[in-house]
Amino acid sequence: SAPVKKSPTGLQDLKITLKSGQAEVDWMIFDAKPWTAGGMQTGKYRNLLAKLGYQQANIDAKLNDVFNALFYGPNKVYFEVGDDMGYISDIKNNDVRTEGMSYGMMIAVQLDKKDIFDRLWRWAVKYMQHQEGTHEGYFAWSCKIDGTRNSQGPASDGELYYVTSLIFASNRWGNDTGINYLAEAQRILN
């Protein structure tokens, strides 16, 4: 097929032709012009799906469906441990990684799921975060699902997402509800 010379605008159908029994969409691109001021400055967060023509009720329903599938469905990646912890499993590798944990926290804070956010954070601190030594404040990037570390070394993308999600949590829920999110973010940054 010929390359696309100009990106289509508006609501578009995505067509996938299967040559085998499954399909994976690795990434999608949206050609949207950047705002001159971000959401923190304007108080408005850009909704690219709405810009593409989707109705807000349909967007909300789809996000809810995806969240429920990932966190509660038969193929879920979120698992609760005891009364106050949880982890995100890398199903393919049967382990827990900082990227997955911090992405799960970002999803939780964006969707106002404080209990899930706090559970993930508690698991990460207990099993992944170095409490002393040269990596103090950073996280072992991979653990078994029982919390045993597969590697001691940190992976910076996980740390960056932890910090970002903790700052978002501080803004959304404050710092006096059992976890001082801002202090936790600052500890990682220090």
Question: Which stretches of residues belong to each language-model region?
Answer:
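Low-complexity, Ser/Thr/Pro/Gly-enriched N-terminal "stalk/linker" regions
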Residues: P34-E99, Q110-I145, R149
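Aromatic- and histidine-enriched alpha-helix N-cap/loop-to-helix transition segments
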Residues: K92-Y103, D112, G153-T164
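Extracytoplasmic
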Residues: S1-P34
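Short beta-strand segments enriched in hydrophobic/aromatic residues
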Residues: L18-S20, L111, L166
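Solenoid-repeat scaffolds in large eukaryotic assemblies
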Residues: G104, I116-F117, G178, A185
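Extended ligand-binding groove/face enriched in aromatic
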Residues: G73, K126-N190
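Residue-level detector of short, conserved catalytic/binding motifs and their immediate flanks
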Residues: Q12, D26, S102-M105, L160
